[in-house]
């Protein structure tokens, strides 16, 4: 096998601060599968598209290295697995309450209409397998700039104690490991219902400039959105155009043959 469980080797700076957990793992050579890196603060984090992502004190942040022989068509689903793992871990550590945490496709975590976290995955193919770095940031005790797990828990479950950062991190990694194993063996299909039960998009209408309106129905086998023409039966996959900061402002339609 590949050795240790996710997080069996955990790197954490003594000062608490790092430029980026992702960069540290990316630049280090020969780290074993499952190596994770966490920091209390990072100043050079990255979001999707290489955008700078500052992470203040109070965020739960980590990156973890996965080495996997899964096919390239399955690798993109690991970002969905990470989002799902985060919401499930919060639920299991917060008295069974998911705190209204929801997944905004493809890789953001929202609560009360505000972004509270996000996932970044990068991959490289080496020696017959993929090396995938999964990075996740979640507002844990920092009430700014939006809201955080601590505030959501206090509002919804007064008197319920906040889990430790370490316990929540362990819970996320445990579930991510389980989900990655499922994707490797069977693809994302066994996880799809759990994922779409926790996302924001079922029934969401997407309007196009030509007046066409599509209704999101779920996730296609490709990992893109599956939508149906409003009032019709034609099915489409919705793809981001790759040039927009917000996926939802630039979706491209591709008709799915009947």
Protein language model regions, located:
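Long, positively charged amphipathic alpha-helical accessory segments at protein N-termini or as interdomain linkers
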Residues: 7, 69-100, 111-258
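N-terminal lobe of the biotin/lipoate ligase/transferase fold
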Residues: 1-96, 160, 251-258
């Amino acid at each position: 096998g590949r050795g240790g469980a996710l997080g069996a080797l955990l790197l954490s700076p003594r000062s608490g601060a790092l430029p980026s957990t992702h960069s540290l793992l990316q630049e280090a050579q020969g780290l074993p599968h499952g190596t994770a890196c966490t920091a209390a603060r990072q100043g050079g984090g990255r979001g999707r598209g290489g955008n700078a992502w500052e992470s203040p004190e109070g965020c739960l942040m980590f990156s973890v290295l996965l080495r996997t022989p899964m096919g390239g068509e399955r690798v993109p689903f690991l970002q969905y697995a990470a989002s799902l793992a985060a919401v499930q871990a919060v639920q299991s550590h917060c008295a069974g309450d998911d705190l209204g945490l929801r997944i905004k496709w493809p890789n953001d975590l929202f609560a009360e209409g505000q972004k509270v976290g996000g996932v970044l995955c990068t991959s490289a193919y080496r020696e017959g397998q993929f090396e995938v770095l999964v990075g996740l940031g979640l507002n844990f005790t920092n009430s700014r700039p939006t809201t955080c797990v601590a505030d959501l828990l206090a509002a919804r479950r007064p008197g319920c104690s906040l889990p430790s950062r370490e316990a929540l991190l362990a819970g996320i990694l445990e579930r991510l490991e389980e989900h990655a194993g499922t994707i490797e063996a069977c693809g994302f299909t066994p996880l799809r219902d759990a994922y779409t039960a926790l996302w924001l998009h079922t029934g969401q209408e997407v309007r196009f400039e030509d007046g066409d309106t599509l209704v999101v129905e779920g996730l296609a086998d490709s990992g893109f959105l599956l939508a149906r023409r409003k009032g019709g039966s034609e099915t489409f996959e919705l793809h981001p155009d790759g040039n927009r900061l917000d996926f939802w402002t630039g979706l491209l339609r591709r008709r799915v043959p009947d």
